[in-house]
């Protein structure tokens, strides 16, 4: 699984961008919960989720500064 590209994020509208940020934060929380309770989880999903969240927040902040 490759890391997501920022071009996909740039093409999103503001509402879907906000929804995606919330979904990724929830996914990271679930991964941390699984790790803490020693359930099966895929550790590489931490990297992918954090990378995606950083992309989303970067685009959101740049749009807020340009407006």
Swiss-Prot record:
What are the recorded GO MF terms, alphabetically? structural constituent of ribosome
Keywords in alphabetical order: Chloroplast, Plastid, Ribonucleoprotein, Ribosomal protein
Where do the coiled-coil regions begin and end? none
Q: Which PROSITE patterns match?
A: RIBOSOMAL_L29
Q: Which GO terms describe its cellular component?
A: chloroplast; cytosolic large ribosomal subunit
Compartment list: Plastid, Chloroplast
Q: Which domain of life is it from?
A: Eukaryota
Which terms under GO biological process does the entry name? translation
Q: Does the keyword Ribosomal protein apply?
A: yes
Which InterPro entries does the UniProt record give? Ribosomal_protein_uL29, Ribosomal_uL29, Ribosomal_uL29_CS, Ribosomal_uL29_sf
Q: Which PANTHER family match?
A: 60S RIBOSOMAL PROTEIN L35/50S RIBOSOMAL PROTEIN L29 (PTHR10916), LARGE RIBOSOMAL SUBUNIT PROTEIN UL29C (PTHR10916:SF0)
Family recorded in the similarity comment:
Belongs to the universal ribosomal protein uL29 family.
What protein is this chain from? Large ribosomal subunit protein uL29c
Gene of this entry: rpl29
């Amino acid at each position: 699984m490759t890391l997501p590209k920022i071009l996909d994020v740039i093409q999103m509208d503001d509402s879907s961008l906000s929804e995606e940020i919330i979904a990724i934060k929830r996914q990271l929380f679930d991964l941390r919960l699984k790790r803490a309770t020693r359930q099966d989880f895929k550790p590489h999903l931490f990297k992918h989720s954090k990378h995606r969240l950083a992309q989303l927040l970067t685009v959101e902040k740049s749009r807020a500064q340009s407006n």
